[in-house]
A protein has these predicted regions:
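Hydrophobic N-terminal alpha-helices or hydrophobic patches in metabolic proteins across all domains
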Residues: 1-104
């Protein structure tokens, strides 16, 4: 999820940095949502870790992830929130897995 003060077109590429991760269960399967901030967004680039976000923004994200698949009759549960360091580790692991599977 990219927190941005501007509207972004679907499939846009935006230079971002991770501030945290929301771990959840999506229809019974583990799912991790990396929360990112655009490098050049003056509204949000003051935040370096998910713990710094205003409570209402954090609550909106958690609520969204808890209901966003309701129309598909699928259950989602927000489980845990982890910091920037954990999100960065997940991104690095995913890059390594991509290289292993698609670049050799």
């Amino acid at each position: 999820l990219v927190l941005c003060s501007e509207t972004l077109a679907p499939l846009s590429l935006v230079d971002c940095y991770p501030i945290g991760v929301i771990s959840m269960l999506d229809n019974g399967a583990a799912d991790e949502k990396i929360i990112c901030i655009p490098l050049n967004d003056p509204t949000y680039n003051i935040y370096k870790d998910i713990s710094e976000l205003p409570k209402h923004i954090f609550d909106e994200m958690c609520h969204f992830f808890s209901v966003y698949k309701a129309l598909e009759h699928k259950d989602t549960v927000v489980d845990d929130v982890k910091d920037r360091e954990h999100a960065t580790e997940i991104v690095a692991q995913c890059i390594d897995r991509y290289i292993e599977n698609f670049c050799k």
